[in-house]
Amino acid sequence: MKARKTLMSLCLLLALPLAAQQKNYVSEVWVADQGNGKYKNPVLYADYSDPDACRVGDDYYMTSSSFNCLPGLQILHSKDLVNWTIIGAAVPYALSPIETPERPEHGNRVWAPAIRHHNGEFYIFWGDPDQGAFMVKAKDPKGPWTEPVLVKPGKGIIDTCPLWDEDGKVYMVHAYAGSRAELKSVITICELNAEATKAITPSRIVFDGHEAHQTCEGPKFYKRNGYYYIFHPAGGVPTGWQVVLRSKNVYGPYEWKTVLAQGNSPVNGPHQGAWVDTPTGEDWFFHFQDVGAYGRLVHLQPMKWVNDWPVIGIDKDGDGCGEPVMTYKKPNVGKTYPICTPQESDEFDGYTLSPQWQWHANINEKWAYYAGDQSIVRLYSYPV
């Protein structure tokens, strides 16, 4: 029996994001790698909201908002930025009392994570809009990951990202959710302790987007050529654009530039994402596109630096602001790797769920019966 994800979405089980269960699975529906040295967008045709990524050697790792779905913070792996598989999850279950683990809380919990690698360890920071900024870490991205640490408590803190500076100081940038904090459209920075487990200074607003960049959010923190850079979207999820802030001082003042917008492309509101580079010296940018019921799809854009400003996508008129590409040459990572895509079906021939499946709350033994010998998963109605 081959069952599609839609069969299980009728109950508490959620099938997005999709994952790879077997090696080099290739979708019959959507393949980004065109097999001719080019790729097409989106590179991930599934709901990976607020993606972030980092490179460690020849390997790339990505995570995204999982909200209330568990296992949360699924970890994807790629060798070439185009072909991806799921290798694990950083938050296998929700913890009490930080969470309400046995009841679905749609849209809550894990918002806009940032994944980083520092001194041999992987870190993931995220904001829980009702609790504050959290962090987990691991030596191996496949796990095990530590239990979440509340780095900075505060209602409305979202979209957190750390930065380890050359002088040993650690900073965290974040935004605010207006629905909880009664403030939005600002970017703030605080300093963390050396272990990156606790904020040691109050947050300071370094950018106010109310005039030119309403709904600025999703900041990602980088440093290059002596400049501190904050990449962030503005203008709203389905209709916005990408802005970059830069300053020689971590607390500013920051100057800004719009570096990516829809333009004449069909890619509405290119939203928050991640800057990554390749071992060969190329620069690339991930972002998502909101397409309503289909979710938030991940796109990959070429990127270059001009006068210490990033230009993302294709800058057709030379004004420093690019527009998204739909097809482009694949990143040069020095090698060619096999085509693979996240899995989108399941034979259910085991006695546990494959890693592409998620629940809306901690698993309850009353919810499902696994009969791998019959290729069956039977779901039960359950009041919540």
Each predicted region: which residue ranges?
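Hydrophobic h-region of N-terminal signal peptides that target proteins for export
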Residues: 11-20
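Carbohydrate-active catalytic/glycan-binding domains of CAZyme proteins
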Residues: 21-384
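Bacterial N-terminal signal peptides that target proteins for export
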Residues: 1-10
